[in-house]
Amino acid sequence: ITVRRALSELEEAGQIYRVQGKGAFVKSQKLSTKLSALTSLTEDMRELNVPCGSRILALETIPAGSKVAKKLHIDENTPVVMLKRLRLAGDSPLAIETCYLHPRVGPTVCQYIADDVSLYAVLWEKCGVCPVYAEQSLEIGLLQPWEQRMLGENAPVYAMFTTRQAFDAEHSPIEYVEGKYRADRYSYHISMTSQHISARQKN
């Protein structure tokens, strides 16, 4: 078998991709997590035996816009901590997450958050709060040029956009997060049950 034929077979199998003028590259394994429980990305990656890291891109206090204020149940222009991070799976960029923290936890998070530190661990260990319920949405969106560059060479122009509004046991908002995940490297697995079947089983 020739090298050219071997590369063609690997490309057809979806194991490599080619870039004109640069050569052939190994495709990263797609990571899939179950969307059935409230977990952090760190926990999801641990379940997959993949090291999870983060790089802080921005950490600042800003006035809450109308959308963020509504999600956090606070008045517009209330100071909130905005944490923007590049999330890593192993050494490879996976997502850009922008988190807006409720004023009751934001200042404490600022003191303890750092690269490769779990936000949920800081919330529990330093703030004494734990997200127990969340509303999450998924859609496909177009990355800005700087976001595409940040997510690595050959990152697709489209990404999976997520939003999450997390609450504590008292149903008070803790955070509102907007994530942009590489669609070629990350996916969600969702299990569903028919309500009609459940109703028949009860009768």
What kind of region is each of these model predictions?
Residues 1-26:
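N-terminal helix-turn-helix
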